[in-house]
Amino acid sequence: MSSFLDLLLVLPAMLIAITVHEFSHGMVADALGDPTPRQSGRLSLNPLVHLDLLGSLMIIIAHFGWAKPVPVNARYFKDPKRDMLLVGVAGPVANFVTAFVFALVLRLGLLSSIGIISGIFLYVVMINVALAIFNLIPIPPLDGSHILKAFLPASAQPAVRWLEQYGFLILFLILIAFRGVFSIVLAPILNLIMNLLLPGSQWM
């Protein structure tokens, strides 16, 4: 963060992005017949139940990160492969929709071009885009792994289960060792989407 003011703007934006993301996972899982998110208290718009300390710090420090995954039990689904795909997609889609809505408010000039509220709205757009893109990376526990899993053959499932056991550690080590590479790869994608939503804007 370049200043304390930036941090004040990022925090509410981060809470909005994380809450929308995880609530959407839980809502879709619940709609498909899995009571686990509701039973675990995750079918909630309270951001505190969705926060992951390390993931939240990564959003503040590195501008991408994650929330506490919503527990889902695929045994409740009629079509586990399809329904896990839908649950996995729900979070990033919700983030993109949220980014679009907040960007639309800014583009329509409904807020002053300067000020705390417009600053928060801009960060809501940026963080929602970043959270959506980052979570599409196919490494557990990120959503991209659930999406990829739906398209893999049965023969690949043992490797997937192994990766699910150690995915978080692998992801963390990659983030630490290759943070610069992540930025180089992800920044052009993020800037492209930001420019589509808010022409002339740049990612953080």
Write out the residue ranges for each language-model feature:
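Hydrophobic transmembrane alpha-helices and their immediate loop junctions
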Residues: 1-204
